[in-house]
Amino acid sequence: MLDTLLINIGQLLTMDQEDGLLRREAMNTLPVIENGVVGIENGVITFVGTAEEAKGLQAKEVIDSGGKMVSPGLVDPHTHLVFGGSRENEIALKLQGVPYLEILEQGGGILSTVNATKQASKEELVQKAKFHLDRMLSFGVTTVEAKSGYGLDDETEWKQLEATAQLQKEHPIDLVSTFLGAHAVPKEYKGRSKEFLQWMLDLLPEMKEKQLVEFVDIFCETGVFSVEESKEFLLKAKELGFDVKIHADEIDPLGGAEAAAEIGAASADHLVGASDKGIEMLANSNTVATLLPGTTFYLNKESFARGRKMIDEGVAVALATDFNPGSCPTENIQLIMSIAMLKLKMTPEEVWNAVTVNSSYAINRGDVAGKIRVGRKADLVLWDAYNYAYVPYHYGVSHVNTVWKNGNIAYTRGEQSWSTATI
């Protein structure tokens, strides 16, 4: 007898097509089972199919989905989860047209977050991040990448990473830890960025030993770290056994996309200014293009990443919130799906694949997350929607009814029909 059966699923989005990254037409394809059923035992999916195929199955608990939709848990592959403070006091300055550098000189911008993060205790950071994770869970997210990067010194970076490790133990959401010590150049290292990067590299062996970090990231941008500095830094991180990511071409077409493809990065993120050559190189690589349209939207910029061109040319595209206190303070990945549909010209099918299958590969979770398949852990979302297009169409709210993590209900806001019936 199974532990749980979800029955009467109007649309069961398994996302289970070909293994590996989805590109071109595969991104525009959604495997859907009408009148579907999912069986769960010991936190693992043991049955996926139609009601007809499920006849005779029994479970301790049978949940009637009411004809609504069920999908895999969503994957958010780019967040800056652990930080202190907030920056709502900067909104008025931005609206007045005060340049970011001037805000920075006043102690605002990233410096404000760095100072608040330094002053916060690890436990304070953990509790604050739990609040944000709870919200992510309520939007249907069950796997999250979490970056450090608000320390710019060894003590605070360690504190952020240790907070992430504690959250992994204490919160239902699966976390993937990324070291972003190279997020900016501290004032004391102005003009000496290579020395700062060497300092960050010197921290990596101990991080590897303590298994606190899976990915190493760097902010490759004008005025921060050059393409050559970024490549050298990430290649050294790879030599130490880390997988790598890169904040690439967010503002200027520096060649970050090209660098990511060249060194075999797991993902290149932002890519608003990615060149035609960069897009071509990404299309011919296994590097995922993780697009962050919520950031462009919140910064009130006109030019978004060329998501439509990327998909048409064969780039594997993922979507993420880029949740952070400065440029995208939202945990709402459903809103990101809507913005991607409207501003990146992605179809609903492409959007769904970008927050499940491709986003899981962007953080090396393609074999465990992003699909409903027998043998995988039961990370599932029941939606207050009857078809997948409705979720990005009806924007600005959460359509999530219930979230299962490893077969257990981790979040619910609706009423289900609970019984011990046999189909």
Curated annotation (Swiss-Prot):
4-imidazolone-5-propanoate binds at residues 87, 150, 183, 250, 327. Pfam families: Amidohydro_1. N-formimidoyl-L-glutamate binds at residues 150, 324, 326. Binds 1 zinc or iron ion per subunit. Its EC number is 3.5.2.7. GO terms for biological process: L-histidine catabolic process; L-histidine catabolic process to glutamate and formamide; L-histidine catabolic process to glutamate and formate. GO terms for cellular component: cytoplasm. Its cofactor is Zn(2+); Fe(3+). CDD domains: Imidazolone-5PH. One of its GO terms (molecular function) is imidazolonepropionase activity. InterPro entries: Amidohydro-rel, HutI, Metal-dep_hydrolase_composite, Metal_Hydrolase. Its main location: cytoplasm. HAMAP family: HutI. This is Imidazolonepropionase. The gene is hutI.
